Swiss-Prot record:
Pfam families per UniProt: Sugar_tr (PF00083)
Transmembrane region(s): 19-39, 54-74, 85-105, 114-134, 146-166, 174-194, 242-262, 283-303, 310-329, 335-357, 374-394, 402-422
Gene3D superfamilies: MFS general substrate transporter like domains
Any one GO molecular-function label of the UniProt entry: transmembrane transporter activity
CC per GO annotation: plasma membrane
Superkingdom of origin organism: Bacteria
Topology Cytoplasmic: residue spans: 1-18, 75-84, 135-145, 195-241, 304-309, 358-373, 423-443
Species annotation: Escherichia coli (strain K12)
GO biological process, one term: response to oxidative stress
Record-stated family: Belongs to the major facilitator superfamily. Sugar transporter (TC 2.A.1.1) family.
The protein's name: Putative metabolite transport protein YaaU
Membrane topology summary: Multi-pass membrane protein
Amino acid sequence: MQPSRNFDDLKFSSIHRRILLWGSGGPFLDGYVLVMIGVALEQLTPALKLDADWIGLLGAGTLAGLFVGTSLFGYISDKVGRRKMFLIDIIAIGVISVATMFVSSPVELLVMRVLIGIVIGADYPIATSMITEFSSTRQRAFSISFIAAMWYVGATCADLVGYWLYDVEGGWRWMLGSAAIPCLLILIGRFELPESPRWLLRKGRVKECEEMMIKLFGEPVAFDEEQPQQTRFRDLFNRRHFPFVLFVAAIWTCQVIPMFAIYTFGPQIVGLLGLGVGKNAALGNVVISLFFMLGCIPPMLWLNTAGRRPLLIGSFAMMTLALAVLGLIPDMGIWLVVMAFAVYAFFSGGPGNLQWLYPNELFPTDIRASAVGVIMSLSRIGTIVSTWALPIFINNYGISNTMLMGAGISLFGLLISVAFAPETRGMSLAQTSNMTIRGQRMG
């Protein structure tokens, strides 16, 4: 039976919705787990006798785990398939979360944080590749933007659960173990999901892919063909692909480091709302997360109307302006601080969404998950450095100069975007993965 429709012509169906919902469970858990440790520290610090060094190690341990997980398991997913790893890593997150409830020393907690960082990091390249490869050209931007928003949903849920458990004796154990509940729900949802059709095709399992398409959509479905050559992990570092690795890692870093800087205004904003102390600080964090989550929503629509390149350039320009205002007017009133913070948070959604969308579009199926993993690992270097260096910089140079530094980094992101950001709107994965950094197509 000859295919009557192309995959990109299929309507958004129940299988697309299920893959999007359960696939975005990984970013949800990342936001949940990373934020929950901050809420739990109020009880953890006296319970395990943590000092400042241990608190710093716990944060660094999770980031180090993410670094390992993203870089290693993206490669493994490209080799063994999306679905198998899709299930294994979510089981591991749940098991480690439960095990964390029984730690009795800082060393044990550190080991658990490194391990959970590894398995959460593993899910990112797997899930984003799965969702991308199951999305049509029209759906792709919305789907990847949804992933970015789910991080903030997870962070918000963590603050709400932490608020609820704040007064419970030994509540920190339940806080850290509570991630097992969404893990179970996500595992149940993922269990019935199929393998990525594009991955099957690239592995020569054509008949299996055809049978799966008939089962899911009731008819054979055609795919735009990617270039037939075999792509290997080391090809990420060749002349064609490595410029894209550096480009996406750069815009990711230029978005993340200033975001950490502007978060220093968080206490002022939540203090204005009377939510800055003790238990209420968890509710204050919800406000901050909502600022950034709202910024992820407009790009879901604009990426397919305005396009990738204009949205990235415009967003970095507005983010630079907001940071510059905060740096150049040090004694501005609190409501102007809130306004500048809101402008930054709103426009950060553009780069925030594109740092997930671009690597999934610009690399072929054979190395897509590997590319996401390597790029995310490189971006984590910036995260680790900013986490360590930002408090020192603020202490030595003040908040105004810190904001100007952030504006400079954001400006660098703007210049890189003007020079190199490609436009992939309306193009199939076969077309986008065949581009060069100059916008030309190979073959």
